[in-house]
């Protein structure tokens, strides 16, 4: 698995330490183990997890501005856990409303000895953080309008929303509240992943 991950990282031009590579492998092994009992992801093959969960999360990293982020609807910690592993100086809150997902994330944080990731069991509309975030991340929302409607209270005044999407559909933009504007649409390249991936940055 290590050789495969090293190859994927090289193709994506992502440079990280040997320790971080090992943490990512350990994360996949943990997810694979828990998945058999708790059905956390439809991806069953650890090699496939490297592409669809790890690399698909990591390619967002260069575009994150700031130090404090929240991953909303994180599921089993995606993209938040991989991003926390390779960005030890940034803080990540991982929010989900399903207990089994947060239990997995707590276990992963403990096993991987991560000090910059905090799991929160809550519905997003009920979560009221003491401090707002530089960035609100999500792979979970069906539309940009849903993301901004549910998460409007989370970013700082100059904070960003980072939506990870498949195909970029312009009609989603027309549904947005006029107070939000698209800052960037970035076509992401994920090695060995079939299909389009985009990062939409708005505020």
From Swiss-Prot:
CDD domains: AdoMet_MTases (cd02440). InterPro entries: rRNA_ssu_MeTfrase_G (IPR003682), SAM-dependent_MTases_sf (IPR029063). It is found in: Cytoplasm. It is an enzyme of class 2 (transferase). SUPFAM superfamilies: S-adenosyl-L-methionine-dependent methyltransferases (SSF53335). It catalyses: guanosine(527) in 16S rRNA + S-adenosyl-L-methionine = N(7)-methylguanosine(527) in 16S rRNA + S-adenosyl-L-homocysteine. The keyword rRNA processing applies. One of its GO terms (molecular function) is rRNA (guanine-N7-)-methyltransferase activity. S-adenosyl-L-methionine binds at residues 73, 78, 124-125, 139. Keywords: Cytoplasm, Methyltransferase, rRNA processing, S-adenosyl-L-methionine, Transferase. Its EC number is 2.1.1.170. GO terms for cellular component: cytosol. It comes from the Bacteria. Its main location: cytoplasm. Belongs to the methyltransferase superfamily. RNA methyltransferase RsmG family. NCBIfam families: rsmG_gidB (TIGR00138). Specifically methylates the N7 position of guanine in position 527 of 16S rRNA. HAMAP family: 16SrRNA_methyltr_G. This is Ribosomal RNA small subunit methyltransferase G. It comes from Haemophilus influenzae (strain PittEE). The lineage of its organism: Bacteria, Pseudomonadati, Pseudomonadota, Gammaproteobacteria, Pasteurellales.
